């Protein structure tokens, strides 16, 4: 339904979870004609294939493990898109992961840890996760783990390494897991824009 609305002002649609829509006008319309719609997934092969078949961008939410392990999913996505006849700028991949940038790796680890521990404590109680483990935190915050927590050189190098596996066009960092001081958050944003982004661009250009 969302895709139908995105394509046309007047929508006629039949589905399985709501009553039919017959010639309904949906307003207001996007300024640029169409909304950019992505399919988000935590690593489901069917979701990757579906995004490819629909010709939509795919965004992988990576919260643990080795991000490079998503490479087969990115390949499946692109293969499915090609088989469905979809090519061009809409066939792209993004990654969303935990991360925080500080002047030094040790500062980043120290600053991100309280929010991470609180999240695992609260959510773990609800979901049956094991208690927060400092060793697990450190493993995920160093390559090949899924947390992009470090200084600008470290984070940039790891983003570029992941790009060699996924070919992703965007990399989102979820920095605040709750309680992150504003000055720490703003410094991380500033370093992302002024230090990490230029490094990533230079490294990719030289590859």
Where do the PLM segments sit?
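Active-site-adjacent structural elements that line small-molecule/cofactor binding pockets in enzymes
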Residues: 1-207
